[in-house]
Amino acid sequence: MTVKVKKGDTVVVIAGKDKGAKGKVIAAYPRQDKVLVEGVNRVKKHTRISTTQRGAKTGGIVTQEAPIHVSNVMVVDSDGKPTRVGYRIDENGQKVRIARSTGKDL
């Protein structure tokens, strides 16, 4: 499946425990069909406590974002509404992403 959500897109979560949350895509993982969204699907990860060279301790319980499946998010257009993503070829022969609902470029 081709992932139409790219890094830097603003998306809204349409399913799951964070339904309705908006965030920016930090990373996209096309092979797994997942995206990492800022502030969404936060999990607590237990990491080993270690000491740095300066003597500071790092680790413990860390809260971070976990990837979410691309089918559970929709790209937000310039009007702030969720939309599906389509493609068209512009006059220069470049492939451009467009919002299916309005036809505007993303």
From Swiss-Prot:
Belongs to the universal ribosomal protein uL24 family. GO terms for cellular component: ribonucleoprotein complex; ribosome. GO terms for biological process: translation. SUPFAM superfamilies: Translation proteins SH3-like domain. One of its GO terms (molecular function) is rRNA binding. The gene is rplX. Pfam families: KOW, ribosomal_L24. It comes from the Bacteria. Part of the 50S ribosomal subunit. One of two assembly initiator proteins, it binds directly to the 5'-end of the 23S rRNA, where it nucleates assembly of the 50S subunit. One of the proteins that surrounds the polypeptide exit tunnel on the outside of the subunit. Gene3D superfamilies: 2.30.30.30. Coiled coil: none annotated. This is Large ribosomal subunit protein uL24. It comes from Salinispora arenicola (strain CNS-205). Keywords: Ribonucleoprotein, Ribosomal protein, RNA-binding, rRNA-binding.
